[in-house]
Each structure stands twice: as C-alpha cells, then as structure tokens.
C-alpha cells in the first residue's frame, strides 16, 4: 500500500523484502480468507475498538478510512462481501486475491522489488543526526534514500518472517520500543473435556474472566473449541488481558451459553423442554439446546443421573443445570505464544509518531506503519485496516513532507 502510493505520485520506490516472496503474512490472515476490514463506516465508532489508542488515530483515519479502503480495492478488481460482525472478506474467500491485486498495483506503478534481502540497520545522516539516509542490508550493501518507510510488523507468526527485526533497528537510533508480547492469541485450557469438542464453534457466547472469585473482564462473540483449548474472535479479543492475569494466579473463564436470557427465562425454557421430552432420558434431552458433543459434557458436569427421565429431574437439579448453562467454568492454562498469535502488542511508543503523516518525531523523513506501532486492536478486520490506513497516509505524506 505505502510503496504503491509513493510511486503513484511519481517517486522512485524500492521495496525491500527479507523473504523470497511478498505477502507471506497477508496470505494467512483471516484463516487464509483475508479479513480485509470491518464495515463500520463511522470513524469514531471504528476507533472505539482501539480503546485508548484510538485518540492517536483519528487524524490518520480521517484521511483514509474504511470507505476509502473499500473503494481502493474495488478499483483493483477485488469484489468484497460482509459477514458476521461486519467483517469484510474478498468474495473469492481467498487472501491470494488481495495479494495479487496489491502486486499488480505496485508493478503498475513500477516499484522496484528486492527479495531475499534482510535489513540489519537504519542509517542516519552523517551531516544531520535527525535525518535518515537509508538502510544497510545483511550483505553489507547500503541503499540510500530520501525517505524510508518501515513496515516490518511485530513478532507474531515468525514463520512468515515477522520476527520483530524493525524493533532492533529503531532502538539503535533512539526510538522507545514497548516490549512486544503475543496478542489476539488462542488459549490453552487445563480442563481435558474441552479438547473433546475440538472443531466445535459457538456464536454469541458471553465470556467473563475471574481471578480469586473477583470478576475481571467480559466480552461476547464467537468461540471455537480446539485440540488445545479455546480460540475464536471472542477469546482472541480477551487473550491479552487473560495473559496479564495469569501472571498473578489462576484465571477462570466463564462461558454463558445463553447471554440473551436471564436465569428465570432459561429455567422456563428448560421446564418446557422437559415437559416435551417427558419420558426421555436426561442424557438425550439437551441436544436441542446445544450441539450434541457439548450437551454430553454438560450432562457430565451437571451431576444429574444421565439415565433419569426428564419428568423426574428435581427443581433443584434443574436450577443447578440453569446455573451451569449460564456459567461453565473453565481453567485457563497459558497463551499459546507468538507462533499462534494473530498480532503482537508492543512496538514503537505512540508519543514518538506524528499520526497526521505517520512520520517519526525523531526523524521526520522516517515513517512507521502497521504492526510496528504499539497499538492494541481486536480481531475482525481492524489490524489490516490499521495497515491500509497508516500505509496510505505514510505514502501520501512523503510527497507533502520535504
């Protein structure tokens, strides 16, 4: 995005890539489908998802937001569709569609691409210590430039080449780097029964975390059971907070399977269900409420005799079942780490970036974009939109900044 925009305005651009090909990380986004953005067109509402960091980004998104991003990709021939929670995907359901469009864009603008070329250092000018003069490659070759844009990403999914290289270069020249940690990462669970449900996904689940019986955070959305524990948007969005809590002791993750119904409403629902089931055994009665694999585990957790007929379940047992459906306690073990994280937290301190241009406040001809910035955001298209927005604004600003 940034390279293409700079070249589009007439500058000579060299795009340096450490890998043997461009776009390795883009190809795995959204499970290989590429969650391009989120179709929230109100900038203020969009940036609320970035919590406290949103205030830094308003001037950036005012220049190039969701609307402009979709127009950009549509002009490149990428058809899109909107799915649950306003997530935008290419109609092809393939990240390759997006990558191919971007490659076509930069090639049309005659961007020079240098592959297999790891950078080791950012060069500062000998005559002006507040000016960047270029970069040094691993082979010791120096590439000089009037403007340098750093888009190396964070430390998540290192197999794609995202190993935090840029943090080291920027530290050397005086930038403050907040230590990166995995963010939007699946969670390993201690309870063995969870792993029996691997592959099962549930929508609209309320998640609440507890530590020492004290409520911590809540969220709602889709969860996915895996062979190691829990994933899915709702879990990923709370993973950073869960990771912090785990430093201080055990964390309980409570699942409310029916967040839109209070205990009384759910009790009535189960009463009616048991009346209909009547002589049916309890162990076979919950399949209409939840997927059968989960229903079997709930039967075990409830401690109600599975052979009991529904019309013989006592009031106390039924109320206890309601409590379970509204509060399934699960013991968190650990976050899975950078190799499974979608993004990383940490990065360049935001006070050292001019968000009107994405330029460094220490070096006005150095631009910092995307995941290299210390900006937390949820899953759902927000990470890629941050990249598109900061990339375009940085590219645009190289023309404005002399």
Residue ranges and their predicted role:
Residues 1-15, 388, 394-399:
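N-terminal Rossmann-like FAD-binding beta1-loop-alpha1 element of flavoenzymes
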Residues 16, 119-120, 135, 142-159, ...:
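Short hydrophobic core segments
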Residues 18-112:
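Conserved N-terminal/central alpha/beta ligand/cofactor-binding core
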Residues 18-22, 27-28, 36, 40-43, ...:
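An anion/pyrophosphate-binding glycine-rich loop and adjacent beta-alpha core
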Residues 115, 296-376:
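A glycine-rich dinucleotide-binding beta-alpha-beta segment and adjacent secondary-structure elements
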Residues 115-131:
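A conserved short coil-to-beta-strand element within the FAD-binding core of flavoproteins
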């Amino acid at each position: 995005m940034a390279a293409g925009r700079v070249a589009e305005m007439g500058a000579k651009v060299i795009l340096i890539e450490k890998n043997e090909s461009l776009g390795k990380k883009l190809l795995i986004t959204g499970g290989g489908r590429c969650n391009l953005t989120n179709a929230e067109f109100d900038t203020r509402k969009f940036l609320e998802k970035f919590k406290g960091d949103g205030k830094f980004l308003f001037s950036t998104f005012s220049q190039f937001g969701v609307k402009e991003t979709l127009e950009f990709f549509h002009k490149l021939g990428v058809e899109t569709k909107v799915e649950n929670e306003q997530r935008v995907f290419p109609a092809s359901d393939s990240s390759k569609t997006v990558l191919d469009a971007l490659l076509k864009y930069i090639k049309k603008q005659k961007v020079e691409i240098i592959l297999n070329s790891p950078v080791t250092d950012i060069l500062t000018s000998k005559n002006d210590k507040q000016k960047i003069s270029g970069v040094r490659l691993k082979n010791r070759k120096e590439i000089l430039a009037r403007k340098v844009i750093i888009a190396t990403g964070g430390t998540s999914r290192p197999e794609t080449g995202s190993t935090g290289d840029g943090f080291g270069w920027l530290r050397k020249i005086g930038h403050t780097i907040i230590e990166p940690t995995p963010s939007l990462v699946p969670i390993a669970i201690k309870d063995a029964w969870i792993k029996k449900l691997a592959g099962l996904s549930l929508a609209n689940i309320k998640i609440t975390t507890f530590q020492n019986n004290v409520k911590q955070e809540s969220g709602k959305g889709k969860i996915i059971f895996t062979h190691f524990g829990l994933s899915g948007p709702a879990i990923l969005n709370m993973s950073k907070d869960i990771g912090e809590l785990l430093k201080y002791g055990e964390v309980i993750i409570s699942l409310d399977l029916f967040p839109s119904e209070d205990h009384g409403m759910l009790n009535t629902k189960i009463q009616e269900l048991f009346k209909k089931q009547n002589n049916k055994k309890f162990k076979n009665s919950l399949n209409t409420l939840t997927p059968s694999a989960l229903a079997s585990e709930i039967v075990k957790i409830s401690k109600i005799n599975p052979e009991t007929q529904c019309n013989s379940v006592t009031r106390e047992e039924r109320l206890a079942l309601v409590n379970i459906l509204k509060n399934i306690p699960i013991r968190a073990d650990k976050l899975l780490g950078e190799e499974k994280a979608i993004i990383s937290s940490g990065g360049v301190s935001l006070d050292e970036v001019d968000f009107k241009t994405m330029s460094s406040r220490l070096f006005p001809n150095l631009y910092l974009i995307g995941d290299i910035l210390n900006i937390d955001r949820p899953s759902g298209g927000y990470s890629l939109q941050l990249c598109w927005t900061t990339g375009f604004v940085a590219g645009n600003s190289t023309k404005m900044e002399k």
